[in-house]
Amino acid sequence: MEKERIELRLDYVLNSGKKTGKSYESILKLIAETFGVQLTTTIHNRNISYYLIAITSPAKLAILINYLNEYSLFTSKYLNFQDFSNCVNMMLNKEHLTISGREKITILKESMNNKRTYGII
């Protein structure tokens, strides 16, 4: 039987600010250093440069979740965070190793970001 791999990562992507003339690079470097990861730059649509912080370590994800539980996000970002937090907790509890756990994670993932069909009222 082929083993399915589930990867859980949280990427924060922010426009590098070339249009506004304001850069978030210094604060984003501090955030990246806090989590022991690199601040990288990526190019997206129309050659727009974005900063990227990617956190994959379960221990570091748990720290981030604790922080965001105390200092909440707003709008659909909050809903995406709730789903993401549920996925992290499932993985920390090894639920992702079961068929039902993988199915639940897939359902949560499929409802995130632009696929979300509901919002905060």
Swiss-Prot record:
**What GO cellular component is one of the record's annotations?**
mitochondrion
Q: What else is known?
A: Encoded within intron 1 of COX1.
EC annotation from Swiss-Prot or TrEMBL: 3.1.-.-
Lineage of source species: Eukaryota, Fungi, Dikarya, Basidiomycota, Ustilaginomycotina
The cross-references to Pfam families, in alphabetical order and at most eight, read:
LAGLIDADG_1
- This protein's major location comes to mitochondrion
What family does the entry list? Belongs to the LAGLIDADG endonuclease family.
PANTHER family attached here? INTRON-ENCODED DNA ENDONUCLEASE AI5 BETA, INTRON-ENCODED ENDONUCLEASE AI3-RELATED
| Example of a GO biological process term | intron homing
What is the role of this chain? Mitochondrial DNA endonuclease involved in intron homing.
Protein's UniProt name: Probable intron-encoded DNA endonuclease aI1
Q: GO: which molecular function terms?
A: endonuclease activity
Keyword list, A-Z: Endonuclease, Hydrolase, Intron homing, Mitochondrion, Nuclease
Q: Which domain of life is it from?
A: Eukaryota
Per UniProt, subcellular location reads as: Mitochondrion
